[in-house]
Amino acid sequence: MKEILDNAKIWLSDTFDSETKKEIQQTFTSSGTSGSVVSQHHVADLNLYKTSFQKGFAHFYGNIEDYAVLALLPSYLERDGSSLVYMVEDMIQESKHPKSGFYLDDLYALKQTLLALEKSGQKTLLIGV
């Protein structure tokens, strides 16, 4: 019986946020760069999460559609569960700029795109690590 209860607790902790008691829609994980155990960030409401970072960006920088969003996030793209990749994917999509995108393993194209966007006066957001 104890094993069944322990398994139920594990399932519940993986499925429901312990603070809000809501079902988890997405679990993001840390990159583990600190050398410790990879941490988890459970999100119970993806719409709220997305609205939060979209409004935060708009508050400080303005409309995302005014920007070309370029991303160079190699180690983040190569693993699952990155909240940064999730946010940047959304920003790329919402920007609707044809040059917005990830520039993985193509630094030459990234450089040429940056030069062309600068020459045209296009507002550009480069996100990289």
Task: Please annotate each region the language model reported.
Residues M1-T29, G35-A71, Q93, K99, ...:
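Nucleotide 5′-phosphate-binding alpha/beta core
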Residues S30-T33, L84, L126:
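Conserved S/T- and glycine-rich ATP-binding loop of Class I adenylate-forming
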Residues L72-L73, I127-V129:
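Short His-Asn-centered micro-motif
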Residues S75-Y86:
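Conserved coil-to-alpha-helix start sites within the AMP-binding
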Residues Y86-K96:
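Ligand-binding cleft/hinge of the Venus flytrap
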